[in-house]
Amino acid sequence: MKTLLKNGTLIDYKTNTFEKCDILIEDDKIAKIEKNIEEKAEKIIDCTNLYIMPGMIDIHCHLREPGFEYKETIKTGAKSAVCGGFTTICPMPNTKPTPDSTIILQKIIDEGKRVGLCNILPYASVTKGERSEERRVGKECRSRWSPYH
């Protein structure tokens, strides 16, 4: 499937420029970025007066799941993030239970993948239960996940 974004203002962070252009997307990948693309597409979106930019990363957000779902869930938080242009969010560890083990962290990561709206990379509590008493998570995480996954 082809989607054509017409007349948008592309924000290019590498060159610090704003440029009016069209973007052709084929099979969920950017195929062309040019002025005045005249190619047929199944979907054409008029982006006049709109900005097009890479997805942003929120390195400090608060999802309340697990434990406080009455405030917010991973799904509702991810929906809000995507509506604001964020494709990756990093929730703080103030949930119940506290993400102070790889088991709890993996549950949050798995729920984020199940929801499937954006990348969810949760912070871990450095100490057990956020009580500054017993350091726990560092070694466990290093043994389970590479820092560059």
Where do the model's predicted regions map?
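Distinct, well-ordered alpha-helical segments
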Residues: 101-105, 131-136
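Divalent metal-coordination and catalytic microenvironments
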Residues: 8, 23, 28, 49, ...
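Histidine-rich, glycine-flanked metal-binding segment
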Residues: 1-4, 10-54
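A glycine-rich helix N-cap at a beta->alpha junction
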Residues: 111-126
